[in-house]
Amino acid sequence: MTEEWSRKTVIGGFGADLAEIVPDKMSGEGSGDLTPELLEAPVMTEAMLASAGIPIIDVPFVTIGGGMGSFVMVDYLRIAGVPTDQIRVLTNIDFPWQTYEYLTRVSQIPDHSRIRSDSSSRPDNIWGFPSYALSEAWQDKSPAHLWHVLIEPLFADYWTPRRSTVFASLGRESKRIGYDKLIARGAVRMVRRRSGGGYFTILTPDAGTSATKRVAYRSRFVHIAVGYPGLRYLPDLQEFREKYQDYEHVVAAYEPHEHVYETLKNRPGTVVIRGGGIVASRVLQRLFDDREKYQLQTNIIHIFRTYIEGKHGPHAWMRRKGSHGWAYQGFNYPKSVWGGQLKARMRKLEGDARGNLYKLMGGTNTPRRRVWQKQMADGRAGDYYRDMQGEVTSVEPGAAGGVVSNVKSRKTGTEQRIESDFIIDCTGLEADISEHRVLNDLLKYTGAGRNPLGRLEVERHFEIKGTANGDGALYAVGAPTLGGYFPGVDTFLGLQIAAQEVADDLARRGWCRKIGPVRSTIQWFKWLTNTPIDR
């Protein structure tokens, strides 16, 4: 079988000898799929792929994931002047904020509501000015947003942007930089070193878009931004769901569960909440809002495994507020991790010392918003909201069709049965990186290792340690790198800081321009006027 394919010029000297290795018309008898030899090869060659009948596409820089991390990286590169034919986004989603939009929606953040992000943390705007607050003030023709930012957090809660504002601005910037032109649809199977330098990224294209089952992207640089490895369930709830095949009464906050709220609108019921982070706060707000709006008789029992009763921390300069089980903090981490003393300190630490500092400043937390405090206080006073500390030893079906949680008190050791109609697991998205196929393959075949928190170990410029190959580099950003030299990786601003570090490293390697003061100023005016980036 003969496959036609076009070979693009690879810049930076990479692949200069390819004309002798791979002809313009590649002939082979392979099926176009991965062979046992390729599956087990830590280093691939053009001849191996040709033998398997897998076509090769040359693009110097590919980013894997297509979500917010990929978008921010592409934004930096386009602003730096990298043309569209030098970048490809390998993804199975339609637009960069698709996954984030889904997760915020199912975790009870509607369009008009506000997300947990700082005013100047704009993934669509690498300069952070104008801020979200200034944009919303202009849009609403009201200075109230600016006044709010001025008096936060002493006299008002932290100002945060509307969900709809974030997505609208992302759509604007995506169109401006020509993001859609860069997308190659499909599922990435693996990234392997290439003999001679660089990498092969094996993509399974969407059905009907390729003559072969697999396509290989030959690149000097690969950027991995795949987000969370998977959805994490509490073990006892996972066991219940699998044993009884009951996915109606025990649900995760990050999966569609609108039926819970609709059922409670039609009859009184009891809901058990598990978890103490921002998602638990959002789910509680939805339950409280519905109870008030529709005059419902919903009862809520909130079970905390770790129960915070007041201020806590190792010393006076590293303490956060807490009460009634909750640990309170405006954002995921103290703000100095994005540009202060904690950021500088973490960059110097290695191994256990770094891991110990993560433990000190990490942990589940949520903002202390006034509306939530009032709702919970009203619930406790009205005896329809109850918080408790305990360890759930097992979950079983209830006699009336609901579920029973057997809870062992952490204080007294006694056990009680709590009957409810639903259990909502709000414990988060974390999962081991080995559960993600691409990340697991990196650990097995490409030399990647784990950091003190068990995630991917990356350099300060986000190159994955142990994966360098010739003049090529393999980068990773976002949640899979938590535990590295920069703590705030899984945030809008964190993704921007990571993208800037990667872009600066690419400039040091001579692959793209560095965004200096003059170029930055010119490009900001282009952003402000929504001028498309040419090429």
Where are these regions (language model features)?
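Conserved N-terminal glycine-rich FAD pyrophosphate-binding loop of Rossmann-like flavoproteins
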Residues: N92-G128, E309-Q329
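Flavin (primarily FAD) cofactor-binding/catalytic cores of flavoenzymes
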Residues: T2-D94, E152-I278, R282-R535
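Flavin (FAD/FMN) cofactor-binding and adjacent substrate-gating region
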Residues: P110-E152, V337-E350
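Short, solvent-exposed coil/turn linker segments
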Residues: P83, T91, R105, P110-R114, ...
